[in-house]
Curated annotation (Swiss-Prot):
Catalytic activity, EC: 3.5.1.5
Transmembrane segments: none
Biological source species: Marinobacter nauticus (strain ATCC 700491 / DSM 11845 / VT8)
Protein name: Urease subunit gamma
SUPFAM superfamilies the UniProt entry points to: Urease, gamma-subunit (SSF54111)
Pfam families named in the record: Urease_gamma (PF00547)
Length: 100
């Protein structure tokens, strides 16, 4: 199977998000890469499901709370930008202050 660099990035992001979901389910606080991966993967899945950019920008702030991440992580993540594939093409989704 041949994967493009973009497909490899998506697969790596999915794997990191899956790990983050498992750790969160165990009650563990997420670190920076896990938090960003989880938010990014949720946005990409929402785009694939046909949700709008505006919906995803809003939903992106509801995925994680400060209690879900290690100390200082929420202050480090000012925005998350994801290039997601929508039914009508690829668009950039930016979520400002995603961890509240």
């Amino acid at each position: 199977m041949e994967l493009t660099p973009r497909d490899k990035d998506k697969l790596l992001l999915f794997t990191a998000a899956l790990l983050a979901e498992r750790r969160k389910a165990k009650g563990l606080k997420l670190n920076y890469p896990e938090a960003v991966a989880l938010i990014s993967a949720e946005i990409m899945e929402g785009a694939r499901e046909g949700r709008t950019v505006a919906e995803l920008m809003s939903a992106g702030t509801e995925i994680l709370a400060r209690e879900d991440v290690m100390d200082g992580v929420a202050d480090m993540v000012h925005e998350v930008q994801v290039e997601a594939t929508f039914p009508d093409g690829t668009k950039l989704v930016t979520v400002h202050n995603p961890i509240v």
